[in-house]
Every structure is written in structure tokens, then in C-alpha cells.
Amino acid sequence: MSWWQVISLAVVQGLTEFLPVSSSGHLAVVSRVFFSDDAGASFTAVTQLGTEAAVLVYFARDIVRILRAWFDGLVVKSHRNADYRLGWYVIIGTIPICVLGLLFKDEIRSGVRNLWVVATALVVFSGVIALAEYLGRQSRHVEQLTWRDGLVVGVAQTLALVPGVSRSGSTISAGLFLGLDRELAARFGFLLAIPAVFASGLFSLPDAFHPVTEGMSATGPQLLVATLIAFVVGLAAVSWFLRFLLRHSMYWFVGYRVVVGVVVLILLATGTVAAT
């Protein structure tokens, strides 16, 4: 990979990881349209370490508070508060994607990164997001979360294994369907992603160096720079997105997804861009 490719894709990763537009889908599209080859699932997973580090920084106080409450609750039963329970919900919600990610890792690295799949997912799942916005009551708050909410949102997170769906899009939509307010759905989804994304990034790190494995290859320095860029851009993106959700719905992103998906489908149908 050239440095221009690395920097461009890292910026795309940082900008799109937390928005309901699918970072992996955008990386696949940008790679094929502008650089004629897919960066690969491993490059995506490794650069996601940068954006998840941004989540750690942004939610540092929340994470420390939840961890303290969780460990404290394990020792003293009377100290089991909402933060203690939230820690368990994150653990419960992480299980589905870890299991499916391991079972279908080969398919994730190859077949589902086909641009026909990506473009179709962008369009189809935009309908799910719109429906969640329309039906969501947004009346439940963090004190009302249950383990079932953690499991449902965790199952929804597995949909993000398909490029074009979007991790934040699937988890926020699930939260809205469950009646959570929009900001809580986003925050819970971002916290839920931390264990799975870090595990995926570390697991994929060796593969990202080898062109024989998939897509384009990157050197160690390139991966480091890409991860740092994704961190900086991602930190700005998550801060902006959560402020955005306080006053706006996700309908803006629904329209964007449909436009991008349709454009990619046209490019594929006319043979302008190769699907794989």
C-alpha cells in the first residue's frame, strides 16, 4: 500500500466508525473505487484499534466508574448498582459477536466483502434504521436496562460482521426498538463494541502484514500511522456524533446510505467497478 492509500483509508475509518454508515463498507468501497483493490478485513480490524482507543479516551470516566462498580459489586452484594449491572450487560452483549466472529472468520474476510453485498446492505439496512427511528419510544434510561437488553443489542452487533450494515447503526437501532433514548442507545453500543473490536484487531494484526492473506498489504509503520490517524479522527467523530444525537435523528444518515448504496450498485451494474 502507498502512504496516500494508508492515510486516506485511515481518515475514512476514523470518520465512519461511529456513524451509522458502516466503516468497513466505506473502506471496501473507497479501496475499490479509488485504489482498485480492497484493503482487506484485517487492515480494517487493525485500524479499528485506533478508533476504539478513541472510545476509551472519550468514555474514560464512564469505563473507570463501571469497572469499579463491577468489581465492588462482586465483593459486596449491597453495592450492586446500575453501573455494576451495566458491566454485566456489556459482558453478556459481547458474547454473540465473539462466537459468530470466530465461526465465520473466513467468510468475513472474503465473501461478504463483495461490493454487491456492501451496497445492498447499505440500502436495505437504511430501512431498518428509519423504522427504528419511527417506532422507538425513547422512554427508557440507563437505570432501566436489563440483561435482556444487553443480549438483544449484542445480537444486533453481530450484524456488523457484514460490511455495509454498520455496528453503530445496528446497535443504536436495536436500542431504539427496545425503547432506549437515542443517546443511551449510542453510548451503550459504543461501550459494547470495545471488547469485541480490540479482540478482533489483535487477532487480525499478523494477517494485516501479508498480501497473500487478503487485499492490499501494509508495513508496520504504515499500520501504526493508520491507527494513530484513525484515533485522532475517530475521537473528533464520536464527540460530534453524540452531540448530534442530542438534537437530531438518524434520518440524515438513512438518506446518505441510500445514495451511496445506489451509486455503488450503478457502478457495479455498468462494470465501472469490480465487485471483488
Swiss-Prot record:
InterPro entries per UniProt: UppP
Annotated catalysed reactions: di-trans,octa-cis-undecaprenyl diphosphate + H2O = di-trans,octa-cis-undecaprenyl phosphate + phosphate + H(+)
Nucleus recorded as keyword: no
Transmembrane segments: 84-104, 115-135, 188-208, 222-242, 250-270
GO molecular function, one term: undecaprenyl-diphosphatase activity
Subcellular location field: Cell membrane
Domain of life: Bacteria
GO cellular component: plasma membrane
Class of enzymatic activity (EC top level): hydrolase
Topological category with respect to the lipid bilayer: Multi-pass membrane protein
A GO BP entry: response to antibiotic
Keyword Chaperone set for record: no
EC number: 3.6.1.27
Keywords recorded for this protein, A-Z: Antibiotic resistance, Cell membrane, Cell shape, Cell wall biogenesis/degradation, Hydrolase, Membrane, Peptidoglycan synthesis, Transmembrane, Transmembrane helix
Role summary: Catalyzes the dephosphorylation of undecaprenyl diphosphate (UPP). Confers resistance to bacitracin.
Misc. remarks from the entry: Bacitracin is thought to be involved in the inhibition of peptidoglycan synthesis by sequestering undecaprenyl diphosphate, thereby reducing the pool of lipid carrier available.
Family per similarity comment: Belongs to the UppP family.
PANTHER family: UNDECAPRENYL-DIPHOSPHATASE
HAMAP family: Undec_diphosphatase
Name the UniProt record assigns to this protein: Undecaprenyl-diphosphatase
Native source organism of the sequence: Mycobacterium ulcerans (strain Agy99)
Gene: uppP
